[in-house]
Structures are given as C-alpha cells and as structure tokens.
Amino acid sequence: MELKDKVVAITGGASGLGEASTRHFVANGSKVMILDINDDNAKAICDELGDQNVKYVNTNIMEEQPVIDAMSKIEEEFGKLHVAINCAGTGYGARILGKEAPHLLDHFKFIIDLNLVGTFNVMRLAAQLMDKNEGEENGEKGVIINTASIAGYEGQIGQSAYTASKAGVIGMTLTAARDLARHSIRVNTIAPGIFDTPLMMSAPDKVRDPLLESTQFPHRFGQPAEFGMLAAHIVENPYLNGETIRLDSAMRMTPR
C-alpha cells in the first residue's frame, strides 16, 4: 500500500513514537488523525503540519464509545481509513512483593487495560471501518500496526504488569492477522527497544547507562523517526503480515 493520500489513525500520535509516526506519514503524503488525550501537544502538531494534513480527536482508548466516536470523526473528515497505528500506552514499575505490600492489583489492571485492551479496542473498530474500503489493486483494504516492546520477551525486574501487557499484544498479532485475512486487512506489531523519547531523555544516568550498555549496533538508543520508518515500510510491503518485528539494535534486556 502506498503512503500518498492514505488516511492513517495514530493513537498516542502527539508524543514520542506516535508523534514521530505522525510526522513521517504526513511527510510522505498521508492524512493523519491523531487519537490522544494530550490536547496541547496535538493541537501544536496540527498547527505546525497543517490542518489539511493532520487532525486531532481527544480519545480515551480504554473506553468503547470514545473510540467509536473517533472512527466516526475519521469517516466524517476523510471518508475512509487505510492504516491504524497503536502507539498509546504507558509503563509502570513495581515488584510483585514490595517492601511494605504486594503489587497493587488496580495498577496491574490499569496497565493491562491501557496497553492491551486499549490496543485491541482500537484494532477491532479500525478494522470495521477499513472493511468498508474497496481495496487496492491487490485487494488490500487496510493495515494495522500495534506497538509492543522487547519487554514483552524479556521483562526486567519490576515490569510484571508492563511485560504482561506487551506480551499480550505480541501474542494476539498472528491470531489477529488470521482473523482479518478474510477481510484483506494485515496486522503486524513493532517491538521497540529503548528509544530516545522525552521520558527516556529525562531519566537519570543510573537508569540510562545500563540500558545503553545493552545495545549492540548501532550502539545507541533508537531515534523515534526510525520507528516511523519501520511503520511506513510495514504499510508499503504487502507480504508482511502476522509478524512482530524487534526494533532494538540486537539489544537483550538484563534482569535489572
């Protein structure tokens, strides 16, 4: 699927990897709808890139109705949807047994709801809208790209909730691709390593240095633009389906 003139929905598209994806797809001729809750950042991006290229709808992906409304907004503004990229999510660090109490169950549920259930919520409703498309010359109607993490394979100490949520995204990738194959919609997942997002840039050296040491080649943190580049390649490569791709410079997470 070519990028030019395609309509792309990006959750978390106002910051970090999502913002990089927004910028990359707009630069390559796509129209983007940002689904986020960061009004200030999203509106600033729309002003910078042009309201004719990118629009924004405040969306809590953990709830059904806001995502239904967002899909209706996409159809109203652009008429159709070709690509959905799920970047919205967050992390949380806590050991199963802390010094004073066990891991808070509500915190575990929140991470699962946002990172896993939220991803599934957007995927199912985006697929419903994509299914209305006539399809490309090869019959393809849409592409869905979810975001996991290398923590979904080798989570560190204190990452039980985050690892479970991202392993869930990885686990449903092939099944989702098989489910949606009859609708001519592809599903793939990117599992990023450590990227130089604002959150990581603000971390103290004692956090950054061990992570940097684990990178191989290139021996550095990933740049958000590199995530956007891979997302674009997934869209453009019609035979790539049901795969989770690690984007991590051959990094493997250590226990801590």
Model-derived segments and their meaning:
Residues 113, 205-226:
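Catalytic Tyr-x(3-8)-Lys segment
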Residues 3-33:
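Canonical Rossmann dinucleotide-binding motif of NAD(H)/NADP(H)-dependent dehydrogenases/reductases
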Residues 149:
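Residue(s) in the substrate-gating loop at a strand-loop-helix junction
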Residues 90, 101-121, 145, 169:
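Catalytic Tyr-X3-Lys loop
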Residues 91-109, 128, 132-138, 158-161, ...:
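Conserved mid-core segment of classical short-chain dehydrogenase/reductases
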Residues 223-247, 252:
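C-terminal substrate-recognition "lid" of short-chain dehydrogenase/reductases
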Residues 123, 165, 173:
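Active-site helix of classical SDR
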Residues 128, 177-179:
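Alpha-helical segment proximal to the catalytic Tyr-Lys
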